């Protein structure tokens, strides 16, 4: 069962992690109407740097081709829009690592492992803790599915901001791996670690 099917089966369309009344980060499922906005985001310089590079700047048609199948639940990637006080501030996605294809996680054997990626749309909001809140919200949402055993991610070794963000959200470095995008820092959060953190929070 995909995360998206699991969410819709239970009627889950949004998850929020509330830190105070003026700083609530929420996640909602992305829709087809968000594709033009995502296209504009993916062409912003601070995102291009870590999301494909200058040579991979997408056209609107590229974004529609790549992301519409996820929106329509035709593949195992689940796309979200992150919201702050009712305004869209970023994109996140989760996917089943096993069988993800294109050279990704080919040695994975656990169907309960999920991969995640995310971005903040506005450069002015970097370094203010919003990325950590977004990741925490996504992690808790995914672990609401009892079938999920571990969440993993793979920031570039040069993306120190992302690495710090993941560490603050409870991820641990497990070394460097080679991915289709090049070297990456392999970072994980297990269900056991997540539940242990919640018990002592």
UniProtKB/Swiss-Prot annotation:
GO terms for molecular function: aminoglycoside 6'-N-acetyltransferase activity. Gene3D superfamilies: 3.40.630.30. The keyword Glycoprotein does not apply. Keywords: Acyltransferase, Antibiotic resistance, Plasmid, Transferase. It comes from the Bacteria. Acetyl-CoA binds at residue 159. InterPro entries: Acyl_CoA_acyltransferase (IPR016181), GNAT_dom (IPR000182), N6_acetyl_AAC6 (IPR030971). Substrate binds at residues 51, 154. GO terms for biological process: response to antibiotic. Its EC number is 2.3.1.82. Residues 25-192 form the N-acetyltransferase domain. It catalyses: kanamycin B + acetyl-CoA = N(6')-acetylkanamycin B + CoA + H(+). It is an enzyme of class 2 (transferase). Homodimer. Catalyzes the transfer of an acetyl group from acetyl-CoA to the 6'-amino group of aminoglycoside molecules conferring resistance to antibiotics containing the purpurosamine ring including amikacin and kanamycin. This is Aminoglycoside N(6')-acetyltransferase type 1. The lineage of its organism: Bacteria, Pseudomonadati, Pseudomonadota, Gammaproteobacteria, Enterobacterales.
